[in-house]
Regions:
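Conserved N-terminal catalytic/coupling substructures associated with nucleotide/phosphate chemistry
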Residues: 1-132
Length: 132
């Protein structure tokens, strides 16, 4: 079992979420975090790691990175600035998705017939209540 030092992956980012795998059929599960990071101070999503910090790896990291990029571009409005990086942890391939603090807030998740914005508060992702 490979337990990771998260700070080695995300550097200066103080906010992050860990995902064991990319949820292709349920992109809202991780797109909420992308919206929340863009609407607040930015942050990182690490794919291929357990909640306890164990490096599990991804079977198709390159394909997953492409799907992440396409999903962000098709499901978030406006499209937030982000960066994808690969990280090899003792033979286990991980993806680190850095989402930068947005200038054009709010950043909405669009899918499942809804348009929702999220924010990050105390390590939790919350739906943002917007005034009309």
């Amino acid at each position: 079992m490979v337990i990771m030092e998260i700070k080695d992956l995300i550097g200066e980012a103080t906010e992050y979420d860990k995902k064991q795998q990319l949820e292709v059929k349920k992109p809202k599960s991780w797109c909420k975090s992308v919206s929340a990071f863009a609407n607040t101070l930015g942050g990182s999503l690490i794919f291929g790691i357990s909640d306890s910090g164990e490096a599990l790896g991804l079977d198709d990291a390159e394909g997953d990175a492409e799907r992440i990029s396409e999903t962000i571009k098709s499901r978030l409005d406006p499209i937030p600035e982000f960066k994808l990086q690969f990280h090899n942890e003792k033979g286990k391939m991980l993806i680190v998705l850095d989402i930068f603090k947005g200038e054009d807030t709010p950043y909405y998740y669009s899918g499942d017939g809804v348009l929702e914005a999220y924010v990050r508060m105390e390590m939790k992702v919350l739906k943002q209540h917007l005034r009309s």
